[in-house]
Amino acid sequence: MASITGLAKDLVPYPGPVPLRRRPTPARRPSETRIAPAVSPADPGLSELAQIEVDFEAGSNTLWAFMRPHGRPCQNPEMLADFSRLQDDIERVFGSGGPDLNYFVFGSRFPGVFSLGGDLNLFASKIRAGDEAALVGYGNACVDVLHRNMNALNLPIITIGLVQGDALGGGFEGLLSFDVIIAEKGTKFGFPEILFGLFPGMGAYSFLARRLGTIKAQEMILDGRTYTAEEMHELGIVHILAERGQGEAAVRAYIAGNRRRRNGQQAIYQAAREVDRISLDELRKIVAVWAAAAMNLTDRDLSIMERLVLAQDKLRGKAQAAQARTAPARALSASAR
């Protein structure tokens, strides 16, 4: 089984994707890795969000969204609220005779991290306060977002999870709700919750049991170790592997190569949801089990959880320092254009 020290050592950032460039979107070859500027509220009618950067690319009818977390790269309540608002916007704008939408791509701008999962600091504080209801409320907010995404917001679209950094705990769970997962080589996946006496309670078991079978799902949840993108690809969880730094290019290549069969592929994913249906009620019942289990954690368990929070804080500091070092070069490059 993985150790808490080993997991903390795994949380080391590597250079993230090419930074956002604020200029009009030209025609691009699939090999390029840039995306267009963040969308304004009037284009095509999506809200500006505090922790999610959004861009609609009309040429391919693709909506790109990237997390820009305030603080640790985890699913804080504000991030969840942003995601829910984005989902509302997508349904409103693209589900009511607006622009066509073929693809929804979701990734992260945090260097080396997709998401480290749930807000462990919040969990520890609510557990110490004996506030089980708050944990249930948080968990339900997570699975509400996940369930809507799993069903592609009831729109004829293909959802793509873009992994350019590590996806742990709830971050991994969230990815499992996408139709297609494209991951850069060397990124890590895993469920560390067992290290502090818990399990991933927001969808992991439901998704993995249907995809891998209950025995393999339990093994992956109970061993607490991290898996590479290559291992996830062998298991069929990751669909496409990309070279380091080429995740966005891989998404573009997938979209470009999928034009003629997109309609059929989208219908297949829709049919698959009917065959292996996961109800919101199932997800919420598991949240209740998770919250009840959380209330039984010991002081030692909570101390381990809080040590992970400290490791995440150090990771955030390293990422901020790296961004500060590269900011002058990015500004010079932008002015040159």
Locate predicted features.
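A structural preference for short, pocket-lining loop segments at secondary-structure junctions
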Residues: 60, 83-131, 144-160, 186-187, ...
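Conserved CoA-thioester-binding segment of acyl-CoA-metabolizing enzymes
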Residues: 2-105
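C-terminal long alpha-helix characteristic of the crotonase
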Residues: 239-301
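Catalytic cores of alpha/beta
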Residues: 170-171
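Crotonase-fold acyl-CoA enzyme core
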Residues: 46-54, 64-69, 151-166, 177-188, ...
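Long amphipathic alpha-helix in the N-terminal Rossmann-like dinucleotide-binding domain
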Residues: 138-140
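C-terminal non-catalytic accessory extensions
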Residues: 3-4, 300-337
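Hydrophobic/aromatic residues within transmembrane alpha-helices
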Residues: 106, 119, 174-176, 232
